[in-house]
Amino acid sequence: MQNADPKELAKFSELAHKWWDPESEFRPLHQINPLRLNWIEQTVGKLDGLKVLDVGCGGGILSEAMAQRGAQVLGIDLAERSLKVAQLHALESGQTRVEYREIAAEALAAEQPARYDVVTCMEMVEHVPDPASIVQACSQLVKPGGWVFLSTINRNPKSFLLAIVGAEYVLKMLPAGTHEYAKFIRPSELLRWCRDTGLDLRHTRGMEYNPLTRRYWLSADTSVNYLVACRKETA
């Protein structure tokens, strides 16, 4: 049984043709991409020459950006239409350092254990039935001493007001129904799953947004959107 919600896959498949439109529903992802990309590269040192896996890659916004920094990237997702958009965009961009596969993280972990220097799973774990299983797969896929980067949304009244009411219904930055509050993940929960799978927390950052300036920035405030960087324990 795949660790995926058919409703979530259908939701993103319907929007697949808009992945690379920076003025579409995916505008927030385009806006935060430089922030998360730079944070990843600053943490790792450099991406050039590294083998990177992007779990839940969608249309390839982050995957392709990491390939542009010199990484050899594999993006995986279970939304077929999104993957086709990602493949087409890479072809049109002449980007040969990125490949895409329709496969679950758990299945790839069984096939390619300890294969990657870096594993990213951004804005994805809050969309699956069993996020702990995704974290475990990421841990299995990364090499000992390698890095795993995760980002998601905290679960509290503030995140409900800002990430759902504000973003989806007031500012209409995202389609209504993009997120389910019950699927939001507290940092304590995410970090417990990381520890249980041999991942050592190294850095945590929050991501904030000013609707007046339409600007995102990283901060110490993890009450809504947040990112974590973990390192796989060595034997």
UniProtKB/Swiss-Prot annotation:
It is an enzyme of class 2 (transferase). It comes from Leptothrix cholodnii (strain ATCC 51168 / LMG 8142 / SP-6). GO terms for biological process: methylation. O-methyltransferase that catalyzes the 2 O-methylation steps in the ubiquinone biosynthetic pathway. This is Ubiquinone biosynthesis O-methyltransferase. SUPFAM superfamilies: S-adenosyl-L-methionine-dependent methyltransferases. It catalyses: a 3-demethylubiquinol + S-adenosyl-L-methionine = a ubiquinol + S-adenosyl-L-homocysteine + H(+); a 3-(all-trans-polyprenyl)benzene-1,2-diol + S-adenosyl-L-methionine = a 2-methoxy-6-(all-trans-polyprenyl)phenol + S-adenosyl-L-homocysteine + H(+). CDD domains: AdoMet_MTases (cd02440). Belongs to the methyltransferase superfamily. UbiG/COQ3 family. S-adenosyl-L-methionine binds at residues 36, 56, 77, 122.
